[in-house]
Amino acid sequence: MAKDYSRTQRIGDQMQRELAQLIQREIKDPRLGLVTITGVEVSRDVAHAKVFITVMGQDDAERVALNMEILNDAAGYLRMLLGKSMKLRSVPQLHFHYDESIRRGAELSALIERAVAEDRRHGDESED
């Protein structure tokens, strides 16, 4: 029987919590926006971790790229801090990726709202 909650998922969840605190407390770069860790995917061999982030209130591609650059530059430092806080034999290399799912979700919600409003408008016109 397969495990419902694998070791890599547990490591990813713990890394997500730890990284959220470490980025907030340890990264002192004033250019860094309000970063939210939306998920961490750890490879099966625990050598690499994809860290998905969003940046609060910054949809500008240039600002997002700057935040990604800052985090990727600090990846080694964050990895060292993770090694101290987590009891792992080897700490995965961190690879930061921008999570566009929230932006896409907001766009889809706006499209649905527009479609519903248009249907209501057409429904009101046909009743007249």
UniProtKB/Swiss-Prot annotation:
Location within or outside the cell: Cytoplasm
Keywords noted in UniProt: Cytoplasm, Ribosome biogenesis
GO cellular component: cytosol
Keyword flag Cytoplasm: yes
Secreted recorded as keyword: no
Residues spanning the signal sequence: none
Record's function text: One of several proteins that assist in the late maturation steps of the functional core of the 30S ribosomal subunit. Associates with free 30S ribosomal subunits (but not with 30S subunits that are part of 70S ribosomes or polysomes). Required for efficient processing of 16S rRNA. May interact with the 5'-terminal helix region of 16S rRNA.
NCBIfam families in alphabetical order: rbfA
Similarity remark: Belongs to the RbfA family.
Subunit organization: Monomer. Binds 30S ribosomal subunits, but not 50S ribosomal subunits or 70S ribosomes.
Protein name: Ribosome-binding factor A
Organism: Pseudomonas paraeruginosa (strain DSM 24068 / PA7) (Pseudomonas aeruginosa (strain PA7))
Source species taxonomy: Bacteria, Pseudomonadati, Pseudomonadota, Gammaproteobacteria, Pseudomonadales
